[in-house]
Design a protein with these regions (language model features):
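Acidic, proline/glycine-enriched N-terminal capping motif
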Residues: 1-91, 96, 225, 292
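Conserved, structured C-terminal
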Residues: 1-16, 20-23, 28-31, 104-402
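Acidic active-site catalytic centers that drive phospho-/nucleotidyl reactions
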Residues: 51, 100, 195
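Well-ordered mid-protein domain cores that form the structural environment of catalytic cofactors
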Residues: 71, 75-129
Length: 402
């Protein structure tokens, strides 16, 4: 039986579609209406509210908390200032990806870690010899993502401090109606946005305050389907879709390094001491095989194929997670699309794909398998820069920086 989020009484009442998914053991809304179009446009045009409580959350405390996390994550957490958040990934001893997530430094000896999967046993196994205490706070802390162009205006009406100066990937403790709330300027939409973390006892008052403040701004509660489209536009990878955790892989060929999955920017191989470094260095010295790229599919070709069948192309903002082959111009398979969608904002058909690195250069012409009426066809596709959508407001500071 799935666990219910602290916000379930609110999300359940609003979910007219009765479309739900299981997310990390929780019941989560797929889309509130029968289609996610309105929710998607709230992300890009006004403001959106998403329950992200199912994220796994860990409190790491102690004199050696920073050193411990610097060992467990690819980022040098010892250099992370108080009030800042960093994105990174965890590797196994063989240098393969286990998970990605964030680490927030709340004070000198207190960090909050988020991830897609549970890692308590993994942390405990590596914590021997470190003066740290690790708490699984997943079920104790409720979390909301407030995303979109109007998110700051709504947020400032709900919290008791002006957060206009909160920088991208900043963290600030504040209060809402006297209840403690941690606000981080983070999110999974690639837009201006914030995430709010509070004790589960304060979950419903926080939701109600945000909904009331957002009424004049077109705030919409959103589900995971709309989020999926937004994160592809932002070029963000999803664990279990764009790469598979090494812990879950049944064959070696399914495992990925950070460089294979487009997360190489989170790794500095010259930094010693993190789990998997030596093996990862060796793999890169031997020559890595894969890379993650953005693809733009030819829209005229999509129209032409559908015209043959007397069908219109589908333009709804619905993401596809079905892996399909990618070929070079000679018909040799060089990779696979992992996520794809029609982007209503960009008016382009876009995809994330894992391809062999020699075909990962911007501008490379490839072909993607495309199925219409159960018949497999091929479409021209071009390797393009990632992210596809990257508005300045995502990182702009709107007040005195903090």
């Amino acid at each position: 039986m799935p666990r219910l989020s602290p916000f379930h009484s609110r999300t359940y009442a609003l979910c007219r579609s009765y479309a739900w998914k299981e997310w990390a053991g929780y019941l989560a809304v797929s889309n509130y209406d029968r289609h996610s179009e309105r929710e998607y446009f709230a992300i890009r045009g006004s403001a959106a509210l998403l329950d992200v409580s199912p994220l796994f959350k860990y409190e790491v405390r102690g004199e050696q908390a920073a050193e411990f996390l610097a060992k467990m994550w690819t980022r040098d957490i010892t250099r992370l200032p108080v009030g800042r958040v960093v994105y990174g990934c965890m590797l196994d001893e063989d240098g393969y990806l286990l998970d990605d997530g964030t680490v927030a430094r709340l004070d000198e000896q207190h960090f909050r870690v988020t991830s897609s999967e549970p890692w308590m046993a993994w942390y405990q196994a590596y914590s021997r010899g470190f003066n740290v205490q690790i708490e699984d706070s997943t079920h104790r802390i409720a979390a909301l993502a407030l995303q979109g162009p109007s998110s700051l205006d709504i947020l400032n009406q709900v919290v008791d401090d002006d957060l206009s100066g909160l920088r991208f990937f900043g963290a600030r403790p504040t209060t809402s109606e006297g209840r403690p709330v941690l606000v981080t300027r983070t999110g999974y939409t690639g837009d201006l946005g914030y995430e709010l973390w509070t004790a589960k006892q304060g979950a419903l008052p926080l939701w109600d305050a945000l909904v009331a403040a957002g009424a004049d701004y077109g705030l919409e509660p959103i589900g995971l389907d709309a989020l999926d489209v937004a994160r592809i536009e932002a070029g963000f990878v999803l664990q279990g879709v764009d790469y598979v955790s090494a812990r879950s892989c049944l064959t070696e060929s399914r495992k990925s390094t950070p460089f294979d999955a487009g997360l190489g920017w989170t790794v500095k191989l010259e930094r010693e001491g993190f789990v998997g470094r030596e093996a990862l260095c060796k793999k890169e010295e031997e020559g890595g095989v894969w890379g993650l790229v953005g693809l733009e599919l030819s829209w005229p070709a999509i129209e032409a194929i559908h015209e043959e069948y007397g069908l219109p192309p589908h333009l709804g903002p619905v993401a596809c997670r079905t892996a399909v082959p990618v070929y070079d111009r000679y018909g040799l398979q060089v990779g696979q699309v992992t996520s794809s969608t029609w982007s209503p904002t960009l008016k382009r058909s876009i995809a994330l794909a894992q391809v062999k690195r020699e075909w990962a250069k911007i501008g490379t012409e490839l072909r993607v398998e495309y199925t219409v009426e159960f018949e497999r066809r091929e479409l021209p596709a071009t390797v393009v820069p990632r992210p596809f959508f990257d508005p300045p407001r995502k990182t702009d500071t709107f007040g005195e920086a903090s």
